[in-house]
Amino acid sequence: YDLYGSGLPVGEALMTLDAIGSNGYALRFEVRPHPLVALLASHHIQEQASGELRDGQVRPLEYIRQTDTGRETQQAQLRFDWPAGQIAAQTHAGSAMLPLSPGVTDPLSLNLAVMSDLQRGQLPEQYALVDGIEPRIYRIRNEGEETLKTALGPVRTVRVSQTRPDGNRTTIFWFAIEWQYLPVRIARQKKGREDLRLEIRSLERSAPRN
């Protein structure tokens, strides 16, 4: 993906999704700022999530996020214990044990959950998400189909908006219908103004891992 900040190119991002065995997944996301941007405000972000698909539902097992600001490195980790019904959450600000119920996900696995629900035609109105050491409820809305002009040509998409509980931040996703609802554009808005956008640049497919 190409990364834009307030309409200007500021870096790139790489998303990797691997199928593990018959029902497992490993998802990775990395944001790399351009060298000049990194000198001014370095925010190299790496996220990874792993889990499994059961009865069409995404069940995350672990999530790790590492943010390098140039001055310090911050890390957040979530471990999902489904048999015990608990989430062990740890960040630089502290740690907590949170209750775990069906449908709860992490920030990265949320993408996979929406992709799966769109394929099944069963997109809910909200998702329960753990970010840091706090559970949050995000409102989800299907805003209909839209054809995008991308680096890979015209792509038919479904536009889906995700709004934070406080309503101050909305993220809009465009999921490609013909590519199993892979996100081809992601735009973040604060108080109605776009501050970040990802545009797909290339797509590679490989055989599933055992």
Where are these regions (language model features)?
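Acidic, serine/threonine-rich low-complexity disordered tracts
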Residues: 1-82, 91, 116-210
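Anionic-ligand-binding alpha/beta catalytic cores of soluble enzymes and soluble regulatory domains
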Residues: 104-111, 127-128
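Acidic/charged, solvent-exposed loop-and-adjacent secondary-structure segments enriched in E/D, K/R, S/T
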Residues: 87, 91-107
